Amino acid sequence: FIKKYLYVAVFIYVPYLFMAQFNPLIRDHKESAVLFMFFMLSTICGSLANNTLLAMGDRDYLMVRVVLVSPYMNFLGRLAVKMVTDFVYFTIILNLFGVSFVHSLLLSLVTMCIRPAGEMIAVLCFDQMQSMYNNRNAFNGTVIALSVFVAYGMPLLKRQISSDWLFFIHPVFVVAALFIGVFSVYYLWDYPSYRKIMQEALHIKREV
């Protein structure tokens, strides 16, 4: 919880305070600014560039090689924990930073649903698009750069937070995100080659 709280404080709330000093329209729309930056940096960027599929820590190594948990169950367990903690923690944290409870709940729900979509894209890249997978660092760097530019650059360039930018808390988008999340979880549940992915993760871990 503390790590997520500090993340929102440093990368979202502090930039908002900086922008608010020079832009009255941003200052007067604090909730919109926090929502927009969170969506770009956490929901989009975090899901695409910071997926857990190939990030194998010591705990995962012990679970698979020592405790003999299957790579399939290990990955799905990690994903389930991440989705639930994101939903619960971010709902609380966004509310603490001045976002209404309803909007905090909706954005956290959207974020939870987009997480498995990011993992599904990583699986598709690993399985079907080797050129993109082999250049994943460049892909991740591009996603991060674009997300940062949109999150910080758009409000500074426009000197306001447009209500049109908050489409992601509209009920229609939330329902669409739910369908995307369900489809992604089904795809990940049915995917047969987690052992192959785990071998690649072990190779990356040895290189590091």
What positions do the PLM features span?
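Catalytic-core elements of nucleic-acid end-processing and repair enzymes
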Residues: V66
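Hydrophobic alpha-helical transmembrane segments of membrane proteins
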Residues: F1-Y61, S70-V208
